[in-house]
Amino acid sequence: MPSVSDTDTSLRFPILIGDIGGTNARFSIVLDANSEPTEPQIVQTANFNTIDEAIQAAVLDRSSVRPNSAVLAVAGPVDGDEIELTNCPWVVKPRQMFANLGLSDIVVLNDFEAQALAVVALGEEHMEKIGGGTPEPNAGRVVLGPGTGLGVAGLVYALRHWIPVPGEGGHMDIGPRTPRDFEVFPHIEKLEGRISGEQILCGRGLVNVYRAVAKADGKPAPFTTPAEITGAALAKTDPVAEEALETFVTCLGRTAGDLALVFMSRGGVFLTGGIAQKIVPALKEGNFRAAFEDKAPHSALMRTMPVYVITHPLAALLGLAAYARNPSLFGVQTAGRRWQA
């Protein structure tokens, strides 16, 4: 198991930072406490058998800089010396990385912990507001993002630190509510008999919803990718795609509202990832905000909570960089998640 004091937060520069999702992995290097991350290297996880191979090819083989430490954010729970990713066959093995990559200190976080850190690191110029009032500066926040899966993390301020709260909230149940939902939901692909957030609120989830809408109405479903469905829906050229995206947006609003209540997110709710960035028009024009606020008896409270879409394409890397430069600013618990050679 990891062996390092949780109170010893400092890391030796240069520091490799990596945001490892189910489909893509993004890497950069923070040279010192005052520098911005180097030009990011982005790879598809399917192109490499292991994360070690990806780091070697994308970072080490392209730079003369040799990192001493690494801060990695992975899509999945961090547990034990071999960390499996939820939507990717890679297994992160920090002790093996010492030998293979020459690192001496590795911290592994949840990918949406990094997104939560990014909320603190980014300015409002990298955010698009979707209704609500003015955020309270030190109030609770929540981050969620549909991508390969559905990531969720809370963010709370306590003892003068921002503390990310990682979890697997993307696997919460989602159920039908309206009469139309009850027509469509029986056709949504289930996972071991249940419909969780990741069966709807991610790329493949949008495809699931699109096919379910088509089946419910006995119509053809020629599109096979989230990009095709989103493009047709936003262009208003395919009614099935339009309804699928509207259902997606509505379910996202309901789920975001539920999570906002859990974390009492008067500091804001933040949507992140490529899907959220691409569907901003649908989020603004559709039922997202109404679904978000429809939480009786707390609808008035919900109307005050602002929602933002994070528009920076590499937000998680910036969050990791902020942490790498000065870990003591954040209340990140590294016990059980930090390895030293």
Curated annotation (Swiss-Prot):
A matching Pfam family: Glucokinase
GO cellular component, as recorded: cytosol
Catalytic activity: D-glucose + ATP = D-glucose 6-phosphate + ADP + H(+)
Major location category of this protein: cytoplasm
Keywords, alphabetical: ATP-binding, Cytoplasm, Glycolysis, Kinase, Nucleotide-binding, Transferase
A GO biological-process term: glycolytic process
Top-level lineage group: Bacteria
Disulfide bonds: none
Documented EC number(s): 2.7.1.2
Family, similarity comment: Belongs to the bacterial glucokinase family.
NCBIfam families: glk, PRK00292.1-4
UniProt keyword annotation of Transferase present: yes
GO molecular function: ATP binding; D-glucose binding; glucokinase activity
Enzyme kind, highest EC tier: transferase
Subcellular location: Cytoplasm
Residues annotated for ATP binding in this entry: G18, D19, I20, G21, G22, T23
Chain's gene name: glk
Coiled-coil features, chain-numbered ranges: none
Protein name per its UniProtKB record: Glucokinase
